[in-house]
Structures are given as structure tokens and as C-alpha cells.
Amino acid sequence: MASLLDRYLRNISDKSQQNLASVAYLASLDHLLHAFPSIGQSIVQELKSQRSRLKMIASENFSSLSVQLAMGNLLTDKYCEGSPFKRFYSCCENVDAIEWECAETAKELFGAESAFVQPHSGADANLLAIMSIITQKIQSPAVQQLGYKTINDLPEQEYEALKAEMAQHKCLGPSLNSGGHLTHGTVRMNIMSKLMHCLPYEVNLDTELFDYDEIAKIAKEHKPTVLIAGYSSYSRRFNFATLKQIAEDCGAVLWVDMAHFAGLVAGGVFVGEENPMPYADIVTTTTHKTLRGPRGGLVLAKKEYANTLNKACPLMMGGPLPHVIAAKAIALKEAMTINFRKYAHKVVENAQTLAEVFQRNGLRLLTGGTDNHMLIIDLTSLGVPGRIAEDMLTSVGIAVNRNTIPSDASGQWKTSGIRLGTPALTTLGMGSAEMEEVANIIVKVLRNITVRSNAESGSSKSEGELSEGIAQEARQRVADLLGRFPLYPEIDLETLV
């Protein structure tokens, strides 16, 4: 049987029409299918799977083949603990060049004073941010006040006392039900809540918006060392000038987690007081959501934190992933193009089109709409748990995720809402007309779900049903859309057996 690459080259005999990234990608698949068939087939099946669903999970996107190819090389074999030009290993000059270029690109793209590009994930970036703040604002001053040069010089008793004191400092962040992330300190099962005394602020239950006066009131009362702003399920924008003032008034460090909206900052959608960069002391982000890069994280900060961040090893990191850092550099360079700016604006336009159609059809959206890339549908009036809505939409080829809403009585597993996002569909090239179609499909599915309780295991095990006619119609409409906007159109799936 001819290889995937052979068939591709035969089908596109004109060399000027051949895509070099496609050639490289298919060549790697050929090798894996031959040498490690089970792994190769799983990769092929995942490609087919992603091509057969409308990806509407707000935290997911599609990276370029260039980004993917950068991760598949011998850079993965190099240990490089430390920071560029200050490594704990020898022979790191090539990794130094890549990491330095990645950091400089990040600084230019976001207007940051310093950039640390090693974190393996957004959670790692957030952990590094809080550890850097603790080190810079609590630990180092305390060590100096005690008359020592470094924390390693402290006697055991004083060291234990300092650890206990650090854990008493307060951190104020958005609660999970109000749209915050589990790494924002308000989830006790997460390590963040164990590093400081973490307090939540909530959205106003009437407006479902964050109330700056209320945040200021809580901050004034508790005087936190850290004020966190960011979200994983909030469909509006923050005013970072206001949050900076709140932080200054109580002497707090302002840390912004822009994992979800970094691409909207890079693309010039969030500007002025909606851009966190001029106001925040530390900004963290992932690189794989609206930035369309590899899975990973970044920390952007004021210069005063640069030295602490560059000591992430041994603070909380070991060896970085140089092959992923190379891919981050490529994604950041892609984000500097005019095409990316157009993309970022289209992401928000598409989300707002979805919102308009949903509201026109009587669905209730948290906050009444969206100003960013996501929206959350409150399913309470439909009597459909988020878990069941997620399952039923998945069954017709639409990937969303269940999501809690403020004061959610259904809990974290069932939930009363679903979250949807437009980054991935916009990457495929879809626009307002397609969003109208997608929204109408979703409305029809949601309004035709029948919820049935499992008598043996109770209502918590209830299941959803959708008539075959409705389901088949939805699947066909989804297939029609995907047929017009294929993922990686340069890769011919007909050759992937």
C-alpha cells in the first residue's frame, strides 16, 4: 500500500502547490503507522475525531502545523534547568537562543517588561506567579529583617515560623461559581489554597457581573497581599485600571490570569483599560487557547519580578520543555501578524452572533450576553442538567462543556449550565452565517432533550434522550458545516486509513 506521503505527492503533482508542512506531517504519520501502528492509528483517529465535531469548548483551539512540527524534534532530548545563559547544564547554547527569542517575542507582542516562557501549563504559570509574589513580597523582606542574606541561612526554628507566617497572608480571587479558576485559591482541594489564606469575591447575583465596589470593600476589610483577576467562565471584560486602584488602595499585588483572553489582548481586541498589561504586576496565561499555540504557559511581569521568575528552578520547576518553547515562539510570532488581529476580532464577533441567536430563541445567557470569546447558557428553565446537555450535543457532533452558574444548586458534576466558545470554529474560517446555523442547531437540540431519571440509581443518574429524527438532522447539519470548513484542509483525510 502506498504511503500517505506518496499519495499526497501523487495527488498534487505540481510542486508549487505542495504544502511543505503537510509533507512533513504526513511523513511523520507514515513512520509512526509503520513503526508503532497502535500509536499511529490513535493519532489518525484523533485527527478524524477532531474533524468530525464542531469544537466549541472555550478553552480549546487548533494550532498550526508549524507549531505542531516544532515539538517533534531532538530539542526534547536536552536538559536545560535554569534560564537563558545561566543554566545548570552545559551545551545549552541552542536552547538559550530559542528561549531568549521566545521571551523577547512575548515581551514585544504584549508590551511586557519581562517574560518567562518555561511553564508547562497555565496551572504551572499560576503556581509560579504566586510563589514569586510570596518570595518577593513576603519571604525576602522577612529574611532581610531577621538579618540573614538568604532563606537557606535561617535556623530551623525561624524558618518554620516564617513558613507559618507566609501561609497567613491573604489572597483575594474570583470564586469558581463566579467564573474563576480552580488555581485562583478558592478551591480547597487545590494547592493554591494551601499556600495562602485565600478569600473569594463573587459576581452580583442580580447582574451576574463582578461588582468593583464590593471587591474594593472586601479588599479594604481583609487587606490581601494578592488580588487576582481572571476567569475561566465569565463572558464579560474586566476594567484593569479600576482593579489596579483597588489593589493599590489595600497594598496588594495585582495578578491577572489572562489564560482565556490572551489572544484577544495580543490581537488588539482588549485595549485601554481592558488590557491588563499596563496595570498588572504579574500576568499569567496559557499558550493554547485564544493564542493558538502549543499546550503551555507564560508569565509576564514587571521588571522587579524578573530575577525571581528566572529562578523558577529551584523555586518550583525543574527542567523546561525546549521543544514546546520552540513551538511557543512560533505561535507568538504568528500572533504578531495582521491575519491574527483579524482572527481575534472575528472570535468576539462570532461569539456575539451566537448570543444574539440564542437570546432570540429564548435561551438565557449569563450576564445577558458576551464581550469576549465565550458564553454560558443557563439551562434551568429547560430542566436539562449541564451534564446531559453536554452528552446530547456531543452525540450530534458538537463539543461543549458543562459549567456551573452562580449559586448553582446542581453541583460541580451535573451543573445547571454549559459553556461555549468560538476560538476553534473561527480558526476554521467560520463567520456570522455559520454561527447562525450552529446556534440554531444547538437551540433545536436543547429544546428537544427529554430527561429521564434512572429509577434504580436515583435522579443524580438521570439520562437524556433525543429523538432519532432530531439527532439525525443535527448530525447532518453539523457534517455539512464541517465539510465546508475542514480542519487542516491541506491534509487529505481520505488517505488516512
UniProtKB/Swiss-Prot annotation:
One of its GO terms (molecular function) is pyridoxal phosphate binding. Pathway: One-carbon metabolism; tetrahydrofolate interconversion; Amino-acid biosynthesis; glycine biosynthesis; glycine from L-serine: step 1/1. Its main location: cytoplasm. Its cofactor is pyridoxal 5'-phosphate. GO terms for biological process: glycine biosynthetic process from serine; tetrahydrofolate interconversion. Its EC number is 2.1.2.1. The modification N6-(pyridoxal phosphate)lysine is found at residue 289. It catalyses: (6R)-5,10-methylene-5,6,7,8-tetrahydrofolate + glycine + H2O = (6S)-5,6,7,8-tetrahydrofolate + L-serine. It is an enzyme of class 2 (transferase). (6S)-5,6,7,8-tetrahydrofolate binds at residues 176, 180-182. NCBIfam families: PRK00011.1, PRK13580.1. Belongs to the SHMT family. This is Serine hydroxymethyltransferase. It comes from Chlamydia trachomatis serovar L2 (strain ATCC VR-902B / DSM 19102 / 434/Bu). The lineage of its organism: Bacteria, Pseudomonadati, Chlamydiota, Chlamydiia, Chlamydiales. The gene is glyA.
